Amino acid sequence: MLQVFERLDHTHDEISDSITLDQDTRKKSRIKSVTDKGANIGIFVERGHPLLVGEILKTECGLLIEVKGKAEDVSTAVANDWLNFSKVCYHLGNRHTTLQIGELWVRFKPDHVLEQLAENYGLSVNSIPAVFEPENGAYGVRSHGHSHAHDS
């Protein structure tokens, strides 16, 4: 089994494999899974720092594994104006729900009450599977790792 104890922001070296994980799994500090090429892997990283899509993991034997996001069921609310978008974000934030915020759209785990709230402010809500990369919170540091490896 491959074992990971080290995270890299980026690398110029060749990526050996990848691992595709949903948001709930990326939050864990101890993960037992299978890479995209089928290798068993154990990931042991610092608690409180979720794995980020694009981040590079280094195995004990030196292989580099890229973290990828798995599409999952999410609700995406899209606004036509900044005022109603801001109001919806405010109310969703007051509910301490996990949010991914984009330009005039906000994404959250499916919840009919939250979907109705967004619709009440004129946002259109759709439920299409997507990679969920929520904000870490007011006191979390958010930085996306990246590699310079390119898909073949």
From Swiss-Prot:
GO cellular component terms, semicolon-separated: cytoplasm
Subcellular location: Cytoplasm
Function: Involved in urease metallocenter assembly. Binds nickel. Probably functions as a nickel donor during metallocenter assembly.
Organism: Psychromonas ingrahamii (strain DSM 17664 / CCUG 51855 / 37)
InterPro entries xref list: UreE, UreE_C_dom, UreE_N, UreE_N_sf
Keyword terms of this UniProt record: Chaperone, Cytoplasm, Nickel, Nickel insertion
S-S bridge residues: none
UniProt-listed SMART domains: UreE_N
BP-aspect Gene Ontology terms: protein folding; protein-containing complex assembly; urea metabolic process
GO molecular function, one term: unfolded protein binding
Annotated SUPFAM superfamilies: Urease metallochaperone UreE, C-terminal domain, Urease metallochaperone UreE, N-terminal domain
Pfam families: UreE_C, UreE_N
Family: Belongs to the UreE family.
Protein name: Urease accessory protein UreE
Organism superkingdom: Bacteria
Lineage, opening ranks: Bacteria, Pseudomonadati, Pseudomonadota, Gammaproteobacteria, Alteromonadales
